[in-house]
């Protein structure tokens, strides 16, 4: 990202922190790493991914699969999706129209954010496998 950022850096950082905090509040207490993905295809359909690790990133679990099996709704997960949409709108206003966003966070609060700009016609298992291979390490 570096000097390529056209958006307000503090606003962007605040949104990253908000997303991380919204999701962290829903994860198991022993989480060590999380990776959040938000991908948008050409039709505007979005895919939302959340993976977490309890062993410092050696293996990851698909939190979205767990969310649908919970007795109580994981409100923070759905709030974070809304924050991802807000992030996308902030970027669009600066003519920074990305198709993919990834946020990686560890338990210490260290994070990295990455954006991709390749057009996505529609989501395929191969694209999701590529995303997991890139951001779950």
Language-model region placement:
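Conserved aromatic-histidine-acidic binding/catalytic patches
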Residues: 7, 11, 72-75, 91
């Amino acid at each position: 990202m570096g000097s390529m950022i056209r958006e307000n850096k503090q606003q962007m950082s605040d949104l990253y922190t908000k997303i991380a905090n919204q999701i962290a509040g829903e994860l198991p207490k022993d989480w060590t790493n999380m990776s959040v993905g938000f991908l948008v295809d050409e039709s505007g359909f979005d895919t939302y991914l959340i993976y977490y690790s309890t062993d410092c990133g050696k293996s990851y679990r698909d939190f979205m699969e767990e969310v649908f099996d919970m007795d109580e709704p994981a409100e923070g997960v759905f709030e974070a999706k809304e924050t991802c949409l807000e992030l996308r709108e902030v970027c669009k206003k600066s003519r920074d129209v990305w198709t993919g966003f990834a946020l990686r966070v560890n338990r210490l609060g260290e994070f990295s954010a990455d954006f991709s700009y390749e057009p996505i016609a529609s989501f395929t298992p191969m694209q999701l496998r590529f995303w997991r291979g890139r951001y779950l390490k």
